[in-house]
Amino acid sequence: MTKLNSIGIAKDPKDTLVIVAMSGGVDSSTVAAMMKNEGYNVIGITLKLYNDSKETASSKQCCAGQDIMDAKRVADKLKIEHKILYYQNKFKEGVIDNFIDSYLNGETPIPCVQCNKTVKFTDLFEEAKRLNADALVTGHYVKSITEKDNTDMYRGIDLNRDQSYFLFNTTKDQLNFLRFPLGNLLKDETRNIARELDLNVADKPDSQDICFVPNGDYASVIEKFRPNSFSKGNIKNMNGEVIGVHDGIINYTIGQRKGIGVSDKNPLYVVKIIADKNEIIVGAKEHLVKTKINLKDLNIITNDQNDFKNELFVKVRSTGRLIKAKIDINDTNANVNLLEEEHGIAPGQACVFYAKNNNGYKVLGGGWIKS
């Protein structure tokens, strides 16, 4: 029987073709170098997702023009083949349009989840298959554990970098094909490896902004793609009294305190956004407390239904904590009862399910928050 290589495939590394998704950042560049140094046949692929402009070209964003050049420089240094796929139309249809629709519906979207689901793990997945690759390798900070031809996803050991929340919409077929070499590393360890390998991106800052949203200015992006799609409306208190006027619901998100446009002797927060009435409802912090969440469009990636008999946890925002919960699933919907109070839960965000076992916190799946 052929021994498994370092990424769990029964082939000699030199006979194993891996596609590395190279964004031009330190993580994916380090992964490409690790694969090359271990003797794998490596092709790096970088996605061009949007047309750069003076407004969107930023060092804080991923997949910008400079990032593509950085990825190519790393590939050249490693002497690996490098391809650029031009996915601007796919990205607009699968990510930007969804982002705009969600904001206009009074939600707070997560375009990175949609990007992973559509462009990266669907279109890039298909390209890797077309090239007869054995695996698609990325620089995400998540762990994957394979037993008996079944792969499960776990939180990365670097909890400050863990990206499992953004990957809950992965399918089982995709997960079985994906590899995450950084899941057992801390970010500082990744940078140290990059320095040891003399990669030019070793100290490159991490991307922070949403790639197509310059400086966090959502309104300008929506105005660009959907001119005149939002308008002024009323701001009301919890008693239904009009206390101000807003310039468009897209400028607000649940839990927001600053920049609301109204003041009171006590702090006010955005409690609810009613899109069909073009209204913003504000209230005190206690009005943001929730213990019940309704979800839609579930995606379950565990094959073991016994996982749901374990102690369960959920995460309701990318930077949030794990909260103990009970989960009642009904087809593609779910009701989640939080065993601890949480503030500022926003429709449009994801609620991701975890179960703790001997390997860590296993990702069971998740869904989109309706209310």
From Swiss-Prot:
Which compartment or compartments is the protein found in?
Answer: Cytoplasm
InterPro entries the record matches: MnmA-like, MnmA-like_C, MnmA-like_central, MnmA-like_central_sf, Rossmann-like_a/b/a_fold
Q: GO: which molecular function terms?
A: ATP binding; tRNA binding; tRNA-uridine 2-sulfurtransferase activity
Q: Where is this region: Interaction with tRNA?
A: 161-163
- The EC designation for this entry is 2.8.1.13
Which residues are connected by disulfide bridges in this protein? C115-C211
Cross-referenced Pfam families: tRNA_Me_trans, tRNA_Me_trans_C, tRNA_Me_trans_M
Q: Where is this site: Interaction with tRNA?
A: H140, Q349
Its domain of life? Bacteria
User: Could you tell me the Gene Ontology terms of the biological process aspect for this record?
Assistant: tRNA wobble position uridine thiolation
One term under GO cellular component = cytoplasm
Q: Where does ATP bind?
A: A21, M22, S23, G24, G25, V26, D27, S28, L47, G139
Query: Which catalytic residues are annotated?
Result: C115 (nucleophile), C211 (cysteine persulfide intermediate)
Q: Which reaction does it catalyse?
A: S-sulfanyl-L-cysteinyl-[protein] + uridine(34) in tRNA + AH2 + ATP = 2-thiouridine(34) in tRNA + L-cysteinyl-[protein] + A + AMP + diphosphate + H(+)
Record keywords: Cytoplasm included? yes
UniProt entry keywords in alphabetical sequence: ATP-binding, Cytoplasm, Disulfide bond, Nucleotide-binding, RNA-binding, Transferase, tRNA processing, tRNA-binding
Q: Quote the function comment for this protein.
A: Catalyzes the 2-thiolation of uridine at the wobble position (U34) of tRNA, leading to the formation of s(2)U34.
Concerning NCBIfam families, the annotation shows: PRK00143.1, trmU
- Its family? Belongs to the MnmA/TRMU family.
- Which PANTHER family does the annotation name? MITOCHONDRIAL TRNA-SPECIFIC 2-THIOURIDYLASE 1, TRNA 5-METHYLAMINOMETHYL-2-THIOURIDYLATE -METHYLTRANSFERASE
Name this polypeptide is given? tRNA-specific 2-thiouridylase MnmA
Record organism: Pelagibacter ubique (strain HTCC1062)
